[in-house]
């Protein structure tokens, strides 16, 4: 996980808005200089390796069957019927920054701090940056985020966050090192790709947006708190909440492990923040999310609690990886030594955002329940006096991954179309001063295309 000096959800992987958005202007097209112009100038500052390619289509449609994307790493994040744009020619740059860990085997590199940068020929002058959700890698949000923003004319960049997979907690020396690296790698990539855009297009981006899902949403929050100078705004899709005194994942998930082992009941989950009405999702999350998520993040921040589980690896088979540690049923974050809270404090959020932020969270999220997450973060922002920079939209019927809509189409709705509307709302807020709607719950429509449409107003 070592960075150079001076560099200030396995579970799902195992497991009215237009699609094209606003097209780039004729001026923006002229500025780009033609198909893959200035390719020879593109050099990612600080990269240890890069591979450039001139491609006819940078979207998942055009990249299907190539090694320029990875559908397996996108599994479960979008509903099956999701429509995405295509036909976006331009330059793709894959590579990595210097790092001492090698969890990421993409391209056979076995090297972390991998990134992907996409530079469309028809550029609108903007840049969108994201970090992988869960413990996935750099191509995870290609369908959910990259396709549409590229079609709108934005340059796009994504990082693997510097570590990936369910053994990510082994990265680093001190508790919290692996998660702290996520933030550093996102900052590093943002700074680098702004210079790459200048090489390709002749000037730096006029607007830079940070966004992400789950852990990528956490990164969005952290970046706008700690490096607002790099961004013009962000969209946070169900970002994970880390606070030193709680709530955080380690205060809500132990009850789920206890329940799975018969040591707790439904009322204990309600007390931990899980929503009434989300019970139909609990059996799946018990098998695919709760146990593994608790044990690997507890190992990251509190390795002394049970050194034998998960130990040096979360498991050697899917069954072992997803199995909970029995000791986590009794885990009490509040009773743990102060050193654990200090480890979490290294990556904790404060609510002190410095640029506009829109947060989305499903009311049926059964991994990061909003009552113990985004509801709390919205209050933190208000308490810091930054409420005018924030809008918070609860998505009725939304859950943590849109792929579950395909299993429960009568009880869930995908969040992605609401996210697309939120991104357009953010850019209108930042660039034209259009006031976004006040905080509210986006209700479930009685009819219509819920997979690809979600007006926020």
What are these model-predicted stretches?
Residues 1-30:
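Secretory targeting and sorting signals
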Residues 29-457:
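C-terminal His-loop and adjacent cap/lid subdomain of alpha/beta-hydrolase
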């Amino acid at each position: 996980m070592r960075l150079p000096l001076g560099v200030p959800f396995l579970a799902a992987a195992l497991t009215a808005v237009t699609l094209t958005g606003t097209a780039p202007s004729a001026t923006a097209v002229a500025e780009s200089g033609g198909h893959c112009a200035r390719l020879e100038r593109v050099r990612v500052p600080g990269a240890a390796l890069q591979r450039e390619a001139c491609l006819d289509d940078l979207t998942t449609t055009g990249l299907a069957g190539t090694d320029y994307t990875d559908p397996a790493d996108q599994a479960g994040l979008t509903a099956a019927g999701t429509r995405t744009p295509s036909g976006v020619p331009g330059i793709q740059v894959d590579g990595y920054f210097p790092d001492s860990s090698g969890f990421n085997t993409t391209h056979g590199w076995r090297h972390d701090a991998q990134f992907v940068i996409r530079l469309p020929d028809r550029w609108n002058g903007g840049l969108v940056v994201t970090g992988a959700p869960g413990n996935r890698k750099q191509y995870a949000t290609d369908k959910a985020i990259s396709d549409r923003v590229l079609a709108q004319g934005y340059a796009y960049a994504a990082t693997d966050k510097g570590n990936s997979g369910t053994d990510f907690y082994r990265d680093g020396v001190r508790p919290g090192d692996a998660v702290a690296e996520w933030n550093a790698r996102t900052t590093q990539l943002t700074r680098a790709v702004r210079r790459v855009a200048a090489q390709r297009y002749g000037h730096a981006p006029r607007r830079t947006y940070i966004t992400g899902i789950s852990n990528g949403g956490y990164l969005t929050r952290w970046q706008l708190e700690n490096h607002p100078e790099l961004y013009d705004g962000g969209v946070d899709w169900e970002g994970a909440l880390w606070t030193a005194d709680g709530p955080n994942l380690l205060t809500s998930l132990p009850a789920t492990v206890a329940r799975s082992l018969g040591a707790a009941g439904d009322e204990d989950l309600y007390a931990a923040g899980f929503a009434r009405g989300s019970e139909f999702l609990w059996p799946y999350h018990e098998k695919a999310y709760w146990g593994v998520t608790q044990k690997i993040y507890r190992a990251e921040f509190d390795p002394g609690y049970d050194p034998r589980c998960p130990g040096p690896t979360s498991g050697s088979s899917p069954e072992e990886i997803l199995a909970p540690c029995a000791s986590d049923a009794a885990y009490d974050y509040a009773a743990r030594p102060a050193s654990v809270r200090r480890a979490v404090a290294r990556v904790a959020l404060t609510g002190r955002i410095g640029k506009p932020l829109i947060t989305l969270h499903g009311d049926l999220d059964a991994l990061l329940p909003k009552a113990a997450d985004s509801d709390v973060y919205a209050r933190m922002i208000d308490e810091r006096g930054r409420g005018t920079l924030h809008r918070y939209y609860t998505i009725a019927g939304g859950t943590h991954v849109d792929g579950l809509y395909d299993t429960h189409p009568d009880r869930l709705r995908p969040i992605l179309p609401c996210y697309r509307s939120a991104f357009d709302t953010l850019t209108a807020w930042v660039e034209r001063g259009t006031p976004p709607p006040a905080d509210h719950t986006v209700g479930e429509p009685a009819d219509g295309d819920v997979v690809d449409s979600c007006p926020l107003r």
